From Swiss-Prot:
Belongs to the universal ribosomal protein uL5 family. The gene is rplE. Keywords: Ribonucleoprotein, Ribosomal protein, RNA-binding, rRNA-binding, tRNA-binding. This is Large ribosomal subunit protein uL5. This is one of the proteins that bind and probably mediate the attachment of the 5S RNA into the large ribosomal subunit, where it forms part of the central protuberance. In the 70S ribosome it contacts protein S13 of the 30S subunit (bridge B1b), connecting the 2 subunits; this bridge is implicated in subunit movement. Contacts the P site tRNA; the 5S rRNA and some of its associated proteins might help stabilize positioning of ribosome-bound tRNAs. The keyword Kinase does not apply. GO terms for cellular component: ribonucleoprotein complex; ribosome. It comes from Chlamydia abortus (strain DSM 27085 / S26/3). The keyword Metal-binding does not apply. One of its GO terms (biological process) is translation.
Length: 180
């Protein structure tokens, strides 16, 4: 069992139940999955660059990414139907907790001028953020990076509100900006 999963089962669940007054333990929010996605439309023209970004996403997540393909052709964007335009990885279970632990304690402190993430969610218990650079991850070999590439990370929880979601993620180690 990972350190973060153990922390969740032993401490975070109790804290959330006390704070929000849940009458049933099944109401306590749980982290369901983490989705990491990259839009690689510019890299789609260069197969070597596209493959390099796929390899980086694979190293960051620990599993093979799914290539997202264009649904239809758009001549103005020089896009063909079925052409790879992005990649995504869905993390669940042990890998999800390992990624969350690494992201909170190793990756986010490496972000330049980091003062915390925005605490605004989607209103339904999910939280998303965008990163500008993949080089903040220690798994990425800086000598092999051909071009900086951003990514989106989405945490999907069973929380009903943004407050519950951000409280859960904050207790797990994600740092948010303080309201002023």
């Amino acid at each position: 069992m990972s350190r973060l999963k153990k922390l969740y089962t032993e401490e975070i669940r109790k804290t959330l139940q006390e704070k929000f007054g849940y009458s049933n333990t099944m109401q306590i929010p749980v982290l369901k999955k983490i989705v990491i996605s990259m839009g690689l439309a510019e890299a789609a023209k260069d197969k070597n660059l596209f493959q390099a970004h796929l390899d980086e996403l694979s190293m960051i997540s620990g599993q093979k990414p799914l290539v997202t393909k264009a649904r239809n052709s758009i001549a103005g964007f020089k896009l063909r139907e079925g052409q790879g335009i992005g990649a995504k990885v869905t993390l669940r279970g042990q890998r999800m907790y390992d990624f969350m632990d690494r992201f909170c304690h190793i990756v986010s402190p490496r972000i330049r001028d980091f003062r915390g993430f925005s605490s605004k969610g989607d209103g339904r218990g999910c939280y998303s953020l965008g990163l500008d650079d993949q080089q903040i991850f220690p798994e990425v070999d800086l000598d092999r990076v051909k071009r900086t590439q951003g990514m989106n990370i989405t945490w999907v929880t069973t929380a009903q509100t943004d407050v519950e979601c951000t409280t859960l993620l904050e207790l797990m180690g994600l740092r948010f900006k303080k309201a002023q």
